[in-house]
Amino acid sequence: MMKRENFPVAKIYVPIERRKTLVQARVDEIAASMLKDGQQVPIKVRPDGERFVLIEGLHRLEAAKALGEATVVGYRVDARKH
């Protein structure tokens, strides 16, 4: 079972191809939900040296950034590089 962790937002890298899928309206919806209920669904990241690479949860990560959060809840996963 994966364990929830707090990851520093500043240490999470989002691959360029992934950034192209960002929909600002969705970020705004999630940010509003996070303000009301907190972060409900963790993101997924994989370790990459001193940083982490985002695997899943782009809109949740961007919502946390928009709210000025220093950390985001997530799972550390072992994933292959593409």
Indicate where each model-derived feature is located.
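Short, charged/polar connector segments at secondary-structure boundaries
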Residues: 1-78
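Short, charged recognition helix plus adjacent turn
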Residues: 81-82
